[in-house]
């Protein structure tokens, strides 16, 4: 379930397989034992009122500076549906994203996360961490390898591999003369196509993860703003070592 709004119990063929209490995240349930192969299956999503559920937690008071819809703070759903300055109150409910049945390989990537550890702005050399989690049958460990590829505009920039010996591991890429990601007005927001593949000993690709990655560092340089005028405080974002002027409106 890519999106359930918001409080729901899920049933498959008359069996309760799970529940949802958060509009903002995906929900996945293992239905291996409940699903009937080659037959019709009945999937039911029973929704409960987010308003009624939230009202169970009310204290009976609210700030006159806020909308009188304090039940919204107890439920993980879009708060603007309870009434906002841009639209009237219309509390929604239902499936707001796709529902799909996934058949998963017992040997697969379960999570891939990229983190820029360091950027040398003078040489544009970048150290990129790739944190990987996998699900593998025990006998596959030490026989399967992870292959890492980084490309830009269809051109392969980096390729490497490592043997998988544990369900969670980190791989470090050293990228030379990289195209850095910059915010608007400071340069090109360059993106790379990053791919991780699980490859069996016979060359079979068991699982693939594709993402787009920007190579940059972002820091917040902050000091106490309640200082005398001759020592003003600081609140500044630093991207790739360069102070960035943040502008915009709400």
Model-based region annotation:
Residues 1-250:
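Secreted/periplasmic carbohydrate-active enzymes, especially glycoside hydrolases
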């Amino acid at each position: 379930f890519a999106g359930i709004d918001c409080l729901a119990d899920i049933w498959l063929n008359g069996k309760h397989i799970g529940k949802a209490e958060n509009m903002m995240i995906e929900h996945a349930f293992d239905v291996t034992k409940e699903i009937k192969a080659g037959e019709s299956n009945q999937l039911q999503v029973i929704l409960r009122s987010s308003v009624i559920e939230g009202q169970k937690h009310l204290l009976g008071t609210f700030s006159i500076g806020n909308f009188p819809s304090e039940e919204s703070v107890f439920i993980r759903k879009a708060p603007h549906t309870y009434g906002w300055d841009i639209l009237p109150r219309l509390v929604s409910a239902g499936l707001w994203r796709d529902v799909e049945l996934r058949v998963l390989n017992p040997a697969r990537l379960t999570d891939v996360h990229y983190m820029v550890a360091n950027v040398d702005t003078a040489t544009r050399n970048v150290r990129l961490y790739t944190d990987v989690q996998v699900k593998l049958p025990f006998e596959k460990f030490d026989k399967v390898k992870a292959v890492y590829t980084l490309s830009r505009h269809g051109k392969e920039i980096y390729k490497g591999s490592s043997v998988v010996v544990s369900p969670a591991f980190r791989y470090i890429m050293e990228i030379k003369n990289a195209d850095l990601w910059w915010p608007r007005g400071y340069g090109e927001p360059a993106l790379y196509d990053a791919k991780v593949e699980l490859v069996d000993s016979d060359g079979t690709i068991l699982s693939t993860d594709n993402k787009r990655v920007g190579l940059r560092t972002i820091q917040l340089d902050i000091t106490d703003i309640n200082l005398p005028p001759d020592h003003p405080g600081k609140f500044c974002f630093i991207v790739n070592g360069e102070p960035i002027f943040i502008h915009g409106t709400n």
